[in-house]
């Protein structure tokens, strides 16, 4: 049990009895420590970390980060509403969205800071309200990420206004009297300090074209190391040269820009474990594999099936049995009727099975999947095969575990269906 980040067997037993499995369990101590770490990101003239709430939008998490002084990065008007319901003031919320639905008008006039992410969005916003203060999101022409699917910059990404459309964006803002006070860029999920320094420099060049800009948002994408062979982002290492660039920009222009960042994975990944149980075991013979079938899968954690992402997996038998279990190569799969519901793919290749050396699992054992705080509960194949959404719980600073989101009922799955 010493291998688990923050759970004990007693915790697992309590969770299974009180909430059932599968269940996402978040750790308040880790959440608060990570929030305090991002608040120490090097900066020259002021910093506001904004939580990328798409990574895990449950209200209890939002309330913790609000208490820690983090702002909100929302990716839809629906996330804006969830943040407000969780207690956030509109002045602490920034909206950068692929789909600028009509509802943005309501939130924009109520104080939410809107970043316009395309030339069409500038046109749409400008027609609605002239002479307004806005932000612009640009694609600086390069990106960084573990896979193409987590890279949100460069010519293969649709996010943001393409860098070569700068003049067109300037002209549109002038046409509608829009005052650009924020420049936003975001390149993806990487950890190379030189890449961050280069993107910061390119972003400052964009800010130079807008004399009214007082804030530069460099987005998030701070990689965490879920597995032993992965490299995590050192915030101090990537932030120090960026702060120096801000100082040089101030010396050159007389403008002291505030910095915003938008961490999601950094805050959440290691702050949650998915508690599941082995519900079946099967083998395909000496030339095949030993499969552990869980009572969870892509309905809770889609990242392995989508990216070939790797997560630490622990088989946790009753303590009295653990010493009699040997390490065995096993493939861990989910409960969906879908061949791609695979939890141990080859790194970066969701098509390939890769057995993992784990304690030999048996039916009824707990299986704890770690590193599941970000883009798991919020980004899964919800209700596939009509499985209900899993419960979510919080291990509080006191050590007690409390429910923060109920398991979905079958009635809730079908409640919106009507007879045509």
Feature roles, as predicted:
Residues 256-420:
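Charged (often Lys/Glu-rich) extended helix/loop segments that serve as interaction or gating elements
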Residues 62, 84-85, 105-108, 126-128, ...:
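Short acidic, glycine/serine/threonine-rich loops at helix termini
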Residues 55-57, 78, 99-101, 118-120, ...:
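Active-site-proximal loop/turn and secondary-structure-junction residues that shape catalytic pockets
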Residues 129-143:
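Glycine-rich, aromatic-flanked loop segments that form ligand/cofactor-binding clefts
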Residues 51, 72-75, 95, 115-118, ...:
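General beta-strand structural signal in soluble alpha/beta enzymes
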Residues 1-132, 156, 171-180, 208, ...:
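A charged N-terminal "starter" segment
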Residues 31, 54, 76, 107, ...:
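Conserved, mostly hydrophobic/aromatic
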């Amino acid at each position: 049990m010493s291998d688990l980040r923050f759970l004990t067997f007693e915790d697992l037993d309590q969770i299974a009895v009180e909430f059932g499995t599968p269940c996402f369990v978040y750790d308040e101590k880790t959440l608060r420590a990570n929030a305090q770490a991002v608040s120490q990101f090097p900066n020259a003239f002021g910093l506001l970390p904004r939580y990328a709430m798409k990574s895990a939008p449950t209200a209890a998490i939002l309330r913790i980060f609000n208490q820690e002084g983090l702002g909100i990065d929302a990716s839809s008007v629906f996330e804006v509403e969830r943040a407000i319901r969780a207690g956030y003031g509109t002045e602490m919320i920034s909206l950068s969205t692929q789909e600028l639905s009509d509802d943005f008008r309501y939130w924009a006039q109520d104080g939410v800071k809107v970043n316009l992410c395309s030339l069409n969005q500038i046109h749409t916003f400008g027609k609605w309200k002239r002479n307004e203060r806005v932000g612009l999101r640009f694609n600086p022409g390069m990106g960084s990420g573990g896979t193409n699917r987590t890279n949100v910059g460069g010519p293969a990404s649709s996010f943001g206004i393409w860098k070569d459309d700068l003049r067109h964006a300037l002209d549109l803002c002038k046409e509608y009297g829009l005052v650009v006070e924020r420049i936003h860029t975001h390149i993806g999920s990487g950890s190379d300090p030189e890449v961050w320094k280069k993107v910061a420099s390119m972003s400052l060049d964009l800010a130079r074209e807008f004399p009214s800009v007082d804030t530069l948002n460099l987005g998030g994408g701070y990689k965490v190391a879920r597995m032993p062979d992965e490299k995590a982002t050192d915030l101090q290492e990537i932030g120090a040269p960026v702060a120096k660039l801000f100082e040089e920009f101030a010396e050159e222009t007389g403008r002291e820009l505030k910095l915003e960042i938008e961490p999601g994975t950094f805050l959440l990944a290691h702050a949650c474990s998915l508690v599941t149980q082995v519900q079946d075991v099967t083998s395909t013979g000496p030339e095949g594999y030993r499969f552990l079938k869980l009572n969870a899968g892509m309905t809770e954690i889609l990242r392995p099936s989508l990216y070939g992402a790797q997560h630490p997996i622990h088989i946790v038998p009753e303590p009295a049995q653990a010493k009699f279990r040997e390490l065995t190569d096993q493939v861990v799969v989910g409960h969906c009727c879908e061949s791609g519901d695979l939890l141990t793919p080859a790194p970066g290749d969701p098509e390939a099975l890769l057995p993992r050396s784990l304690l030999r699992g048996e039916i009824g054992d707990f299986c704890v999947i770690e590193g599941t705080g970000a883009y798991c509960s919020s980004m899964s194949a919800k209700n596939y095969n009509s499985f209900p959404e899993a419960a979510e719980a919080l291990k509080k600073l006191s050590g007690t575990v409390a429910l923060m989101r109920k398991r979905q009922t079958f009635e809730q799955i079908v409640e919106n269906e009507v007879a045509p």
